[in-house]
């Protein structure tokens, strides 16, 4: 285990205390960034809460902090430890059969890494509740964790990541027993890499990921697993370009449809054109934190 504590860092959002940590898993050093909560005292304080954000393809924890405009750092102001894990070779080994990246070829066990990371945070920081979220490949990693270790997770969220079709899912993932988890999905209708309506997903001709369900089918799948009280979701228009479908129940599911928005994390910034249109109508980190009750 290696820990490096840095002086307070001034970001576009606020001042944070950042720690770089590492642990050994599968004989490999796995690294991560921790953002400390603002008020981590009190036996029953929210500082016992961990929020893990998984980065997208060709990113790292450091890159995704900047990519998301440091907006997830702000969850530390809500009393959470925020952790950004680093994937191996800039990817996480998600559940898609079509993931043709080094992390798959190397047999990286990112589920085991997540388990070790949670144990580390429990041992060193007293974590008792764990929420997870991810973007793109990181969102796909969240979907895998929801299947394989659901009892470790108090709530999950994905951005720009539809569920892979059964034929594009690792067989071992589908064998796990269902366990309900509150879940929020966010998807743009103009996403060029993870099509809102489903189908072939990927980045360019060299990085295809196989077929996925539509955003609505993905959310409905988890609503059914959660025992939703309504088969058809209630629909609410939050703004001209944001529509929310909600399946109620003890473990609710929400699908936030971003009309005309691309493959990105809404965070009060403009993204490169190749990702599709940006939006200033919401901040994903705030929406997700509110859904989790943080």
Where are these predicted regions, by residue range?
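Alpha-helical scaffolding within the catalytic cores
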Residues: 66-71, 166-175, 239-243
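Serine-hydrolase catalytic machinery in alpha/beta-hydrolase-like enzymes
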Residues: 23-36, 40-41, 45-131, 140-148, ...
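An N-terminal hydrophobic leader/cap segment in hydrolases
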Residues: 1-22
